[in-house]
């Protein structure tokens, strides 16, 4: 809640204590851990043009990375009920995409999508119904997460908790 103090001008952004762990999602359907790995964004097109240079200030991510969860909401398009999206098309920003794009994380998301589709058919539930009342608990979402974990597709790293701020061992 210290962010409100920044908005009101009581403290500077530099005075905030930055989180030492990734965001925890109640609708997690998988996990990943990979360094941010940006491909260069070139000034001119085609990118192979001799003498072409990276666009200044475009690469970020020189900081530490932490394990992260894959939220189901990132797989559900806002206007299409009968589709789950994973892989390079998952709904993440370009910073997150630099880590999501590797195979092991795409496999985790793909396994989650397949399990979610099967679960939805078995229970007569649309995937969006599993997340529409977040952060409130949803019994069907909890059942899906139990199935994912039982199938060997974990939804959280050991000791994942909003109270655990010591993720230094995971860097």
Segment roles from a protein language model:
Residues 1-171:
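Flavin (FAD/FMN)-binding glycine-rich loop and adjacent Rossmann-like elements that form
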